C-alpha cells in the first residue's frame, strides 16, 4: 500500500518542476500570528487575534477573531494590516489569501482590499465557501 511520503517521492521523481519547487525555501510553511488584548482590565483579556502561515510567499489567513465587545472599532482591520505588513517585511510575501463562509466575513475582507477569487456553493451543504485574495 502506498503512503503519502512514498507517493510524494514517486511524484517528485517523475516531475522535475515539482522536485525543484519542493527544494525551495518558500515551500516550508512558517507560522505568523498577531494578537491584541484589551487596554483596560486586570487580566489583559484577549480582544482579538489572527493566526496564519506563510508559504510560497503568500500569507494564508487561517483564523481571524475579534471579541464581540471589540467589534466595530477597527481592530480586525488593524490585525490584518499588521499581519500583512509582517508577511511582506519578514517573509517577502507578495499576496494574501483567506477562505471564509458566507455567514462569516466575506464583506469585511472585501472592505480591507481583498477580492473574491472563487466561491463554492454547498461547501458544506447549505453554505457557500469563498476564497478571497489580495496583492501585498
Swiss-Prot record:
Give the molecular function GO annotations.
acyltransferase activity, transferring groups other than amino-acyl groups
Stated EC number for the protein is 2.3.1.-
Record's keyword terms, sorted: Acyltransferase, Antibiotic resistance, Transferase
Gene name of the encoded protein: bls
The record's section on InterPro entries has: Acyl_CoA_acyltransferase, GNAT_dom
GO BP annotation list: response to antibiotic
Name listed for the protein in its UniProt record: Blasticidin-S acetyltransferase
Species whose genome carries this gene:
Streptomyces morookaense
Q: Outline the extent of the N-acetyltransferase domain.
A: 1-136
What role is this protein assigned? Confers resistance to blasticidin S antibiotic.
The protein's matches in Pfam families, at most eight in alphabetical order, are given as:
Acetyltransf_1 (PF00583)
Amino acid at each position: 500500500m502506498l503512503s503519502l511520503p512514498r507517493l510524494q517521492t514517486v511524484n517528485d521523481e517523475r516531475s522535475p518542476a515539482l522536485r525543484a519547487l519542493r527544494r525551495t525555501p518558500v515551500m516550508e510553511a512558517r507560522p505568523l500570528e498577531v494578537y491584541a488584548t484589551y487596554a483596560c482590565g486586570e487580566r489583559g483579556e484577549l480582544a482579538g487575534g489572527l493566526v496564519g502561515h506563510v508559504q510560497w510567499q503568500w500569507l494564508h489567513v487561517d483564523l481571524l477573531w475579534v471579541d464581540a465587545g471589540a467589534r466595530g472599532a477597527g481592530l480586525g482591520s488593524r490585525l490584518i494590516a499588521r499581519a500583512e505588513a509582517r508577511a511582506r517585511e519578514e517573509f517577502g510575501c507578495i499576496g494574501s489569501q483567506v477562505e471564509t463562509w458566507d455567514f462569516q466575513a466575506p464583506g469585511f475582507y472585501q472592505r480591507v482590499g481583498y477580492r473574491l477569487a472563487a466561491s463554492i456553493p454547498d461547501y458544506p451543504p447549505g453554505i457557500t465557501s469563498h476564497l478571497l485574495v489580495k496583492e501585498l
